[in-house]
Amino acid sequence: MNFLRKIVRGCRDEEDQKPALVSAPPDDDDLWLPPPEYVPLTEITGRKNMRNFCVNGEVKVCSPNGYSFKILRHILRSFDGVYSGNQRMRGLVKVVIGLALSGGPIPEGMNWVYKVRRTLVFQWAESRGPLDGEELEYSQEITWDDDSEFVGSQIRVSARQCHIQGRIWCINMNSRACQLWSDMALKTQQSDEDRNTSLLLE
């Protein structure tokens, strides 16, 4: 247990260090996911629950044994059970986390840092999603460990409605990034125009 405390302390002590050069995960990590492909939707049935959100997301992962997407997937699979933020924005938070993790990490000491800042258009199913004008400031730490590995993650997501033109949130279902999205069990609706495109509904 003291060993784990030392690791956590080590991760936090190095937070303020100057970021190193941008680096991609090892080539032999077959779970590395490239950025998802965006497919604009020209028409969406019912615009009642569609809103533009300016989002900022940051995921900081502390993994003393090196970068491992297998552990990130484990954390994301159990995300619904540990999420402590606004339940009306749970789906939005998962999308932002997924987008951040699908990008290139920046190493900071023992940490890998992923960031995303975008304007996205979300559509929720009837009576779901955030209230009109509702904003989100979400921050949480999630840890996972077994006999051989300890991983700590810090998640920060902020979202507010904005009127800047955004892109419909959707992904190409043929992309390898879907390995990550499917783990998060997002409720989606298939586009009539493009069978490879889905829209967030939860």
Curated annotation (Swiss-Prot):
Which cysteines share a disulfide bond? none
| Function of the protein | Plays a major role in assembly and budding of virion. Completely covers the ribonucleoprotein coil and keep it in condensed bullet-shaped form. Inhibits viral transcription and stimulates replication. Plays a major role in early induction of TRAIL-mediated apoptosis in infected neurons.
Q: What is this protein called?
A: Matrix protein
Keyword Membrane among UniProt keywords: yes
Q: From the UniProt record, report the name of the gene that encodes this protein.
A: M
Originating species:
European bat lyssavirus 2 (strain Human/Scotland/RV1333/2002)
- One Gene Ontology molecular-function label: structural constituent of virion
Provide the membrane topology annotation: Peripheral membrane protein
Give the miscellaneous note: Most abundant protein in the virion.
Q: Where is this motif: PPXY motif?
A: 35-38
Q: Where in the cell is it found?
A: Virion membrane; Host endomembrane system
Q: Which UniProt keywords apply?
A: Apoptosis, Host membrane, Host-virus interaction, Membrane, Viral budding, Viral budding via the host ESCRT complexes, Viral envelope protein, Viral matrix protein, Viral release from host cell, Virion
